UniProtKB/Swiss-Prot annotation:
Its cofactor is Zn(2+). It catalyses: tRNA(Thr) + L-threonine + ATP = L-threonyl-tRNA(Thr) + AMP + diphosphate + H(+). NCBIfam families: thrS. One of its GO terms (cellular component) is cytosol. The gene is thrS. GO terms for biological process: threonyl-tRNA aminoacylation. This is Threonine--tRNA ligase.
């Protein structure tokens, strides 16, 4: 009979096979009521599952991350229950958990509307109020097929076909509704009260645009109403910061159907973009990078040699000319190897750091495009470091330091790092992987940085570090990458003459800090809600006159500031000064300079910030010095 060992080391013995729920009840009524599932010897199981042998057990409640994910998964099944009651001819497809929520894909004869979504949510709440138990039945394969055949659930039958080795499957019953899943799921609908459906979208069966289109209902679920309310507030704040809305309001860019996934930069947005590029150019030059420029359209033969044609062709834009196939480059690395290959290099010339603001194009599915965050045409702050094995650690450490400095300049102080190590299928010897992984780990350790280890998540050609920024809303954006590559230099014939006069292949470090410029601008827009630090603001100061009598001096101040290297504009319109101040405050201009008769007489400007602070009157030279200090701080706090 089983003896159950709990996380605190205490043990409970039973004279019969015992369910997770029974163990919880033996500990206390409160825990029994809160039990969502269990973890038996490290494996998640349903609360109703029996434990027949000695085992360790952790009771899973809504306070646990696993409990929250189970609640979300069960909410997806609840969508199915509600949809089948309201729209009996709908066909249910799949309903997985995603980050902070869930969705269900459904085939139906017409598009769902917001009114439909409201009706589905209302029905889900009504079902929850019935407080019914969710029943799990492990069912033989043939019976599963009979169940879904009788219900006309064609997609479920296709999913069963995808699992030929499964002789028994878990069926979960929500009253008359049944769904197929490995589980676990909540034992009762009382756990599902704190949910909300969030949006509708299209999807394709198996994610393939060639297949039939489905409808996707998204939702979120939390452990309690307080967590749900906090999430909704965060989402509302994120919507306020939507880079597409702010981009239009601040006249930064636009997108249009004739060029899907391609950005039309307006003067304000292009100014911001150029500030980023000029900053990165300066940083890279100061850190020993050599800037290059490579072609955008390259013959198929190079992509075949690099392996991209075989593995990436569906994502490449291609064209033909004079019976030759070409691809618009989706990435820069093969072209950078071509630059390295011009003339045999000596070990004395390594490391060689080649950088390019490389324009790339990828044929992303139209449904995946999102503003300037997910586009088809983009530019990367891309660079490749060609070095010896002995130089891997030093180059990695230097890059990590540079990356952290850059992020601080943009105002990001919380950075998450992941170190991904060797997968099962890989090139290169175990000894080489040992050295490469040790080099990246040592580089992170030497910088005093914490990181998450991702075993088996590296590319087949080398381990990597990913850098993810946390913005003001706590959202995480993966931006920087440091990827070691043992494969591409061999495939493309990159060699150098080593110290012993033999020829060796260099190690290639793919690296980016910002990633896509377009996406990084989108992140900045949302992080700052368009109120960029002075060094990034498209217009750093606007000069406004009160009456026409001050127009000449206002124009003179504008000229002085622009000649001093700042981005200043004057607003000489015949409008009330309050109107002008409000307009430029909404346009997020950092500094508003007001000129009246007194300022003309004293040769000063009255300075206000966009936040409404009155900095008083000061000579133009003093303001220029003040602005220069603000610009030099970049995005770092005043204390740094």
């Amino acid at each position: 009979m089983p003896t159950i060992t709990l996380p605190d080391g205490s043990q409970r013995s039973f004279d019969h096979s015992v369910s997770v729920a029974e163990v919880a009840a033996s500990i206390g009524a409160g825990l029994a009521k809160a039990t969502v599932a269990g973890k038996v010897d490290g494996k998640l199981v349903d609360a109703s599952d029996l434990i027949t042998n000695d085992a360790s057990l952790q009771i899973i409640t809504p306070k646990d991350q696993e409990g929250l994910e189970i609640i979300r998964h069960s909410c997806a099944h609840l969508i199915g229950h509600a949809v089948k009651q309201l729209y009996p001819t709908a066909k249910m497809v799949i309903g997985p958990v995603i980050d902070e929520g869930f969705y269900y894909d459904i085939a139906y004869e017409r598009p769902f509307t917001p009114d439909d979504m409201a009706a589905i949510e209302q029905r889900m709440h009504a079902l929850i109020e019935k407080d019914y138990d969710v029943i799990k039945k492990v069912t033989p394969r043939a019976e599963v097929i009979d169940v879904f055949t009788a219900r006309g659930e064609d997609y479920k039958l296709r999913l069963v076909e995808d699992m030929p080795d499964e002789q028994a499957m878990g069926l979960y019953y929500h009253e008359e509704y049944v769904d197929m899943c490995r589980g676990p799921h909540v034992p009762n609908t009382r756990f599902l009260k704190s949910f909300k459906l969030t949006k509708l979208s299209g999807a394709y069966w198996r994610g393939d645009a060639k297949n039939e289109q489905l409808q996707r209902i998204y939702g979120t679920a939390w452990a309690d109403k307080k967590q749900l309310a906090a999430y909704i507030q965060r989402i509302e704040e994120a919507e306020k910061r939507d880079h597409r809305k702010i981009g239009k309001r601040l006249n930064l860019f636009h997108l249009q159907e004739e060029a899907p996934g391609m950005v039309f930069w307006h003067p304000n947005g292009w100014t911001l973009y150029q500030v980023l590029e000029q900053y990165m150019r300066k940083v890279q030059r100061e850190n020993g990078y050599l800037e290059i420029k490579t072609p955008q359209v390259v013959d198929r033969s190079l992509w075949e040699k690099s392996g991209h044609w075989a593995n990436y062709a569906d994502n490449m834009f291609t064209t033909q000319s004079e019976n030759r196939d070409y691809a618009i480059k989706p990435m820069n690395c093969p072209c950078h190897v071509q630059v390295f290959n011009q003339g045999l290099k000596s070990y004395r010339e390594l490391p060689m750091r080649l950088a390019e603001f490389g324009a790339c194009h990828r044929n992303e599915p139209s449904g995946a495009l999102h503003g300037i965050m997910r586009v088809r045409g983009f530019t990367q702050d891309d660079a490749h470091i060609f070095c010896t094995e002995e130089q891997m650690q030093a180059e990695s450490a230097a890059f990590i330091k540079l990356t952290m400095d850059v992020y601080r300049d943009f105002g990001f102080t919380e950075v998450e790092m992941k170190l991904s190590t060797r997968p099962e299928k890989r090139v290169g010897s175990d000894e080489l992987w040992d050295r490469a992984e040790a080099a990246l780990a040592a580089a992170l350790d030497s910088a005093g940085l914490a990181y998450d280890l991702q075993p088996g998540e590296g590319a087949f050609y080398g381990p990597k570090i990913e850098f993810s920024l946390k913005d003001c809303l706590g959202r995480v954006w993966q931006c920087g990458t440091l990827q070691l590559d043992f494969n591409l230099p061999i495939r493309l014939g990159a060699e150098y003459v080593s110290e012993d006069n033999s020829r060796k292949h260099p190690v290639m470090l793919h690296r980016a800090i910002l990633g896509s410029f377009e996406r990084f601008v989108g992140i900045l827009i949302e992080h700052y809600e368009g109120a960029f630090p002075a060094w990034l603001a498209p217009t750093q100061a606007v000069i406004m006159n009160i009456t026409d009598k001050q127009a000449d001096f206002a124009a003179e101040v504008e000229k002085t500031l622009n000649e001093s290297g700042f981005r200043a504009k004057s607003d000489l319109r015949n409008e009330k000064i309050g109107f002008k101040i409000r307009e430029h405050t909404l346009l997020k201009v950092p500094y508003l300079l007001v000129i009246g008769d007194r300022e003309v007489e004293m040769q000063t400007v009255a300075v206000r910030t966009r936040e409404g602070a009155d900095l008083g009157s000061m000579p133009v030279a003093q303001f220029a010095e003040f602005l220069a200090q603000a610009v030099s701080r970049r995005g770092r706090p005043d204390s740094e």
